[in-house]
Amino acid sequence: MKKRIKELTDLLNRYRYDYYTKDAPSVSDSDYDKLYRELVTLEQSYPEYVLQDSPTQQVGGTILKGFEKYRHQYPLFSLQDAFSREELDAFDKRVKAEFPNATYLAELKIDGLSISLSYENGFLQVGATRGDGNIGENITENIKKIKDIPHQLSEPLTITVRGEAYMSRQSFKAINEARQENGETEFANPRNAAAGTLRQLDTSVVAKRQLATFLYQEASPTARNQQNEVLAELADLGFSVNPYYQLTSSMDEIWDFIKTIEAKRDQLAYDIDGVVIKVNSLAMQEELGFTVKAPRWAIAYKFPAEEKEAEILSVDWTVGRTGVVTPTANLTPVQLAGTTVSRATLHNVDYIAEKDIRIGDTVIVYKAGDIIPAVLNVVMSKRNQQEVMLIPKLCPSCGSELVHFEDEVALRCINPLCPSLIQRSLEHFASRDAMNITGLGPAIVEKLFLAGFVHDVADIYQLTKEDFMQLDGIKEKSADKLLAAIEASKSNSAEKLLFGLGIRHIGSKVSRLILEVYGDISALLTAKEEEIARIDGLGSTIAQSLTQYFEQKTAAILVDELKTAGVNMHYSGQKVNSDAALFGLTVVLTGKLNQLNRNEAKDKLEALGAKVTGSVSKKTDLVIAGSDAGSKLEKAKSLGIRIEDEDWLRKF
């Protein structure tokens, strides 16, 4: 189970990066949700194996360069997803167990890009993207080009509000027609178009593309008592507020609202992908609190994926950086969610066998919103002695024999000299989350590799201007930019380098956790497996993978070559202080604090080494209780958990 949890964590984190950071989803919503729910189930059954970088413990995406980073004063959370009436009823039961008289506000889930707007004395100061929930991108100048966002409010308030920026279907169609005429790549969907627009460095482009917004939340403290009052105030202040919502205490009425909206979603001028249900009382919201990732007082019902039939014409097999061989089906073109689809993932050999997918089959292809399609199943009634799919025995890149480990669902090439494996590893090293070498994408990497200029990541730092100039299509100016990007990458903090090495099970967050303890890449050459396994959030699988990598002679040589080239080996963040007063304690805040707001208290606790969570359990070490503390305080007392007040916290 531990191994499966790790596999799911790594896979889902890769999909999250593609979705949130690159705005280029690589898996369907349905497939992602299926894997995510499997991970949630396993983590609930085996909580001791939950990893620090699990997507169940995270929000949103990572940060692209090009805009200044912006730390949100009030974090942005994701929402818990629901896909059935039963899950909504379970949510209702949990809420009503604490607040029998709770009412809900159901709002449309706009398929756009989350934004945060901060005003001082009524004037817009900062517009930012969500990013990872704590740090986003400052896109203020682009935000000012969206016509329905007021630069000055109708009242001189200091306030932070949240909402969604989107592109209407009409604007999306016009933009894609213009891009087609100009020979440019068309946007896949309105969400991608909106995301790409907000990241434009040329603000005039933003103005031309006619984005719009719907605001739905006051993140800063508000005098309003109910969510529907918040929407009314936002409208009074001059913001656009979506007119479709329903206030009720009945889940039957909410379900009727969902079905009504689902039936008319194609008639709307913009894309939606579900309905969000929130506890209407803000006081109840505060008492219900948050999990690590999501509020306990809200849930997002997501509409089912759209499905179409297509015929499988052939299958391509490609090798990834870890050697995993992935099948992709070539299809008869079909229109799906507003785009023409001619390729779909088949996931892995076990999936093909389970579904009995064959060449020539008519299959169901599905795609939710802006997600790359996948094959759901075969239409058996249309099968007519189709060709059984031949599973490759040899690597399509190097010809080596493929292996299928018992505990894995994928075929894998284990030849370290496989050209595709090397190229994918180089691409990963240069990617944004790793060393962020701008311009060094797949096409350039392939040319460098085929020319014999690079065979491992250390070779990147030996490249010269003359090397680049020998490649087709590379001019002097491009060569200079590439060399500058390579040089700039040398000063990255070491966790980006560790992640860039592509060690199995070592993601970006795990890299940071490791280096918070060890401080330097060189120290990992002699790190002991049992020491690494003791780091909170890691465990034996990660520890074994890391030590196996650094025990190789080639790893020591590579580290030495990178160090000689001037690549930074040192972690620039704050190392873990095991002497902090509350180091290692799990703490819960409950009730109303008089001197500190919630975020200030949370920051103080984390600075003291504590981990702050939203619910009381047997794992909780300490509860900080303010006035009017409710069920969390009672539960803490029943479990015999240590309880302190705000004055105790302020003494530190």
UniProtKB/Swiss-Prot annotation:
**Which PROSITE patterns does this entry report, sorted A to Z?**
BRCT (PS50172), DNA_LIGASE_N1 (PS01055), DNA_LIGASE_N2 (PS01056)
Q: Note the CDD domains from the entry.
A: BRCT_DNA_ligase_like, LIGANc
Task: Give GO terms for biological process.
Answer: DNA repair; DNA replication
Q: Name one GO molecular function term.
A: DNA ligase (NAD+) activity
At the top level, the lineage of the source is Bacteria
| Gene3D superfamilies, sorted | 5' to 3' exonuclease, C-terminal subdomain, 6.20.10.30, BRCT domain, DNA ligase/mRNA capping enzyme, Helix hairpin bin, Nucleic acid-binding proteins
**What is the documented function of this protein?**
DNA ligase that catalyzes the formation of phosphodiester linkages between 5'-phosphoryl and 3'-hydroxyl groups in double-stranded DNA using NAD as a coenzyme and as the energy source for the reaction. It is essential for DNA replication and repair of damaged DNA.
Q: What protein name does the entry list?
A: DNA ligase
Protein species of origin? Streptococcus pyogenes serotype M6 (strain ATCC BAA-946 / MGAS10394)
What gene makes this protein?
ligA
